[in-house]
UniProtKB/Swiss-Prot annotation:
Protein name (record): 2-ketogluconate reductase
EC number per UniProt: 1.1.1.215
Pfam family, one: 2-Hacid_dh_C
Biological process terms in GO annotation: D-gluconate metabolic process
Length: 310
């Protein structure tokens, strides 16, 4: 019988993570609740992604679960109250993906405002010799509203300021260390800005916070960028606003029903779409994978976590 702790792996493992985990743990890929019954008492740890989390039925099925190591920074799909009640440690890959996610927010903003994807398609379709390429919008002197002003939101502010853009932010509380204007009313922020960038945490508190009223406040010349969670946006309201051109466009990295997104998005020329790729660089994903493993090793060595939430 192996002396290695048994770990349930909910998401597929990248090679560097799998190789390192196999040296210290016995791995059990999750397939179904039915199959989990056979190994449930042995499972002491879980690896998962921020998008997958740990469904309650899985947590409930594991009587000896001690630790969850998340490959990401989102915990909205983990019942943290239940984890606290059961004294289950939870760790995330804190401070590993801030720069790449902020870069993606700026890339989406530029792509949709400057019509980069539309112009790429225009050239590839051979239209350049006989037609006029569509115009984009300037970034300089535009106003950017950032909803959510944690590490990622502040990194976005630093980047867009370099373009000569004015920044204000909405957050649960003011950040006195920032020189940007704090706007406690989200609709007022949407009314003020030309670009609204979403960097809030997921979960019930932020669910559908971007609704029809907020989008109408953003207006026909406004752009929406979402690198937060798909649940933050009322997608029916967003699709309606895009189809009716009540907002100018949207750059979206996240959706409500990933990866099976609403097909209505696919035919909209005023959108730029990504497959939840904001942190998807070789460098960052390698750093994240190593931290997931390091947290598990630290826990099973001396019951500590390097980047704990709980």
């Amino acid at each position: 019988m192996s002396s290695k702790p048994d770990i349930l792996t909910i998401d597929p493992l990248v090679p560097v993570m799998k190789e390192r985990l196999e040296k210290s743990f016995t791995l059990h890929p999750y397939t179904s609740l039915e199959n989990l019954k056979n190994i449930a008492p042995a499972i002491r740890g879980i690896t998962t992604g921020g998008g997958s989390g740990v469904p309650s039925e899985i947590m409930d099925a594991l009587p000896n679960l001690e630790v969850i190591s998340v490959n990401g920074v989102g915990t909205d799909r983990i019942n943290l109250d239940e984890a606290r009640r059961r004294n289950i440690g939870v760790a995330i890959t804190q401070n590993t993906l801030t720069d790449d996610v902020a870069d993606m927010a700026v890339a989406l903003m530029m792509a949709v405002m400057r019509s980069i994807v539309t112009n790429d398609a225009f050239v590839r379709a051979g239209k350049w010799p006989s037609a006029t390429a569509p115009l984009g919008r300037s970034l300089t002197r535009k106003k950017v509203g950032i909803a959510g002003f944690g590490h990622i939101g502040q990194a976005i502010a630093k980047r867009v300021s370099a373009f000569g853009m004015e920044v204000a932010y909405f957050n649960s509380h003011a950040r006195p260390e920032s020189t940007c204007h704090f706007e406690p009313d989200l609709k007022a922020l949407a009314t003020w800005c030309d670009v609204l960038i979403l960097a809030v945490s997921g979960g019930p508190r932020s669910a559908n916070m971007i609704d029809r009223d907020t989008l109408d406040a953003l207006g026909k010349d406004g752009f929406l960028v979402n690198i937060a969670r798909g649940t933050v946006v009322d997608e029916a309201a967003l699709l309606s606003a895009l189809q009716e051109k009540r907002i100018a466009g949207a750059g979206l990295d996240v959706f409500q029903n990933e990866p099976n997104i609403n097909p209505a998005f696919l035919s909209l020329p005023n959108t730029v779409l990504q497959a939840h790729q904001a942190s998807a660089t070789v460098e960052t994903r390698t750093t994240m994978a190593n931290l997931v493993v390091d947290n598990l090793i630290a826990y099973f060595t001396d019951k500590t976590l390097l980047t704990p939430v709980i």
